[in-house]
Regions:
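C-terminal region of N-terminal signal peptides and the immediate post-cleavage residues
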Residues: 40-72, 144, 283
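Active-site SXXK
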Residues: 123-141, 212, 244, 274-279, ...
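Beta-lactamase-like hydrolase cores
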Residues: 58-122, 146, 196-204
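A small/polar active-site loop signature that marks catalytic segments
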Residues: 249-394
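Mid-domain, small-residue-enriched loop/turn segments at the edges of structured enzyme/sensor domains
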Residues: 100-102, 157-242, 249, 283-284, ...
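Short, well-structured active-site flanking segments
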Residues: 137-152, 288-291, 396-397
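Terminal targeting segments of Actinobacterial cell-envelope proteins
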Residues: 1-25
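Small-residue-rich helix-loop
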Residues: 82, 113-115, 334-495
């Protein structure tokens, strides 16, 4: 699913909070007085006369670099100089940011540029970085979600006596073959309901004397999350949430250029209707009408199908900002953590995972898993720490969108030098634009960054996106310092 059009705050709720945001402050990496002293000493050493050194009784060589020289602490001086230059380069962009924003760039564990890194901000879809990372750790990278089809007894002579239950396991990418072309981002990863229907037929089923019954009992039946306006679902930004969703619960494929069909009010009933239709197309007689209900204990599975792995789903939700996948993973996290397949249980488990992962929790307020809710709060410090925890060569880094390639950055930064230097997660809500990920300046030294802009004006637009790109362009030369070879001690020379 694509990033949503601008939205507005509609509802508030009690959220899972791990801290209280600190006051507003705009800061620049401080240059301590010792740096000035070192710089003066360094200048004196580089420009002043050499010092004679006696070796035994004969002064045969002159030391070109005195002991009290900046050349003898090149790493410290280089780091300080790089931070000062980076801050100066970023200053024009930082000066244009709204007060309710945060910025943090870090490289090799050191701050490059910062502006209110601990401020509480609405992250929009940058929250998916947390959801994807937590899902890998809490659910397992190789875990798959199973959709089963079961009956009270195995088919006898091709006849299922009674109902045929399709039991939802939380698979977010169940799709019919006919629906796939109408996805906003055609999926390389999906679970084919057509294949599931073929497997039912292959098991020998020819007649169902009852109904196809949709079972969504693994999760609750709350279709949305706190803070969502109804248009999120009606405009197809996210499916109605359920453990059993087929084709995003759309009644028919959406028109490519026209408005989306409204979603089915009952996702599990819609799923039962879809499977009934597919079975009848394959010559299976289904006597009853589709309905919703929980499968009784002791049923026998007739057929089933597994989803892609959690790792594959996490990659998809990160690169394409898939809201439905994010939300169903959170419900599954809640189910595994506490037995409750709810958004509330899932966000509580994710918040607990953040704390146990030793990530910054001073600002952590979760309302959903996708970032659609304006009730979410995180900090740039948390987002960058999460990226650094994984590293620039991690799976998380590889899932990020790239300019000019399929994903949410396909139409951004594709025509300039940033194209091959940025991997990032985008975010977009009304009054919010965010971008977090990895940036490689010309030096080749990876920089983790987060920039979250919350505006109080009529709404965020392309102008806010330009600011984030402008900031990265300003740091293409990082680190801007003399080379270590220029600062290293000179070789002794003859007296």
């Amino acid at each position: 699913m694509s990033e949503p059009e601008p939205v507005e705050r509609v509802v508030r709720r009690q959220r899972h909070t791990a801290g209280t945001p600190g006051p507003r402050r705009r800061s620049i990496v401080p240059i301590v007085l010792a740096v000035s002293g070192a710089a003066v000493l360094g200048w004196w050493a580089l420009s002043g006369p050499a010092v004679d050194v006696a070796v035994g009784t004969e002064a045969s060589q002159r030391v070109a670099t005195p002991v009290a020289s900046a050349r003898r602490v090149p790493e410290w001086v280089t780091r300080t100089s790089a931070q000062r230059a980076a801050t100066a380069d970023a200053a024009p962009t930082l000066g244009n940011l709204p007060d309710t924003s945060c910025v943090l760039l870090r490289s090799n564990g050191r701050t490059v540029v910062e502006d209110q890194p601990g401020a509480a901000v609405i992250p929009a879809s940058n929250l998916k970085l947390l959801t994807a990372s937590a899902a890998i750790d809490l659910l397992g990278a190789d875990t798959r979600f199973h959709t089963g089809v079961a009956a009270a007894a195995p088919p006898s002579d091709g006849v299922v006596a009674g109902d045929l239950f399709v039991i939802g396991g939380g698979d977010p990418v169940l799709s019919t073959d006919a629906y796939v072309p109408y996805e906003d981002h055609p999926r390389d990863l999906l679970t084919s309901v057509d294949v599931l229907a073929d497997r039912i037929v292959a098991s020998g089923v020819r007649t169902v004397t009852g109904s196809v019954v949709g079972d969504e009992s693994r999760y609750d039946t709350v279709r949305d999350a706190p803070g969502w306006p109804s248009r999120y679902i009606t405009d197809a930004q996210v499916s109605p949430l359920s453990a059993l969703v087929i084709d995003d619960s759309r009644a028919t494929p959406a028109a490519i250029e026209g408005p989306k069909d409204p979603p089915a009010a009952q996702p599990a009933l819609h799923a039962a209707e879809v499977l009934t239709r597919l079975l009848r197309q394959r010559g299976v007689t289904v006597v009853g009408t589709p309905r919703v209900g929980a499968a009784p204990a002791g049923t026998t599975e007739v057929a089933g199908i597994d989803s892609p792995t959690v790792s594959q789903l996490a990659e998809q939700l990160t690169r394409f900002s898939d809201n439905t996948t994010s939300e169903l993973l959170v419900k599954e996290i809640g189910k595994r953590a506490s037995g409750a397949g709810t958004t509330e249980a899932g966000t509580a488990a994710v918040a607990d995972w953040v704390r146990r992962s030793s990530l910054p929790t001073e600002v952590l307020d979760l309302a959903d898993g996708s970032g659609l809710s304006p009730d979410n709060r995180v900090s740039c410090a948390l987002l960058v720490a999460l990226l650094e925890r994984a590293g620039p060569d991690s799976a998380l880094a590889s899932w990020l969108a790239r300019p000019g390639q399929p994903g949410t950055l396909q139409d951004r930064m594709a025509g300039d030098e940033l194209r091959d230097r940025v991997r990032a997660k985008t975010g977009s809500l009304n009054n919010v634009r965010s971008l977090s990920g990895w940036f490689t300046p010309r030096s080749g030294q990876p920089v983790a960054f987060a920039m979250v802009i919350n505006t109080t004006a009529s709404g965020a637009d392309r102008g806010e996106e330009v600011l984030s790109e402008q900031l990265l362009r300003s740091e293409l030369g990082y680190p801007e310092v003399p080379g270590l070879g220029d600062l290293a001690p000179r070789a002794p020379r003859p007296a």
